[in-house]
């Protein structure tokens, strides 16, 4: 017997699963399809939330990244409450060296 779903999410990485959890919390019936972990992008990012270190030239993109970063502590707390598992989130900053272009 097939079960009707409201939403299909393709990709079981951090973003796809986060979207699925939030939609399901709001009452949607969600299915997530993911090929496998090796091909997912989530494990390559190492959990870095550093929009200032990305040299973003688009003000809109930088604004989006900054707003997302400020929402992250609330989201990780929500995940910990839902799952009973600590996320390990630690807002510790980064060190980003700045190099000047050589003058010739």
PLM regions and their residue ranges:
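A secondary-structure boundary/capping signal
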Residues: 10-11, 45, 93
């Amino acid at each position: 017997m097939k079960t009707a779903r409201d939403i299909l999410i393709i990709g079981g990485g951090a973003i796809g699963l986060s979207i699925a959890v939030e939609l399901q919390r709001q009452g949607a019936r969600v299915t997530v399809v993911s090929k496998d972990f090796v091909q997912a992008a989530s494990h390559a990012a190492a959990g870095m939330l550093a929009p200032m270190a990305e040299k973003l030239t688009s003000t809109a993109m930088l604004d989006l990244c900054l707003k997302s970063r400020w929402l992250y502590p609330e989201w990780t707390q929500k995940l910990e409450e839902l799952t009973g598992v600590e996320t390990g989130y630690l807002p510790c900053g980064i060190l980003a060296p700045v190099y000047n272009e050589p003058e010739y």
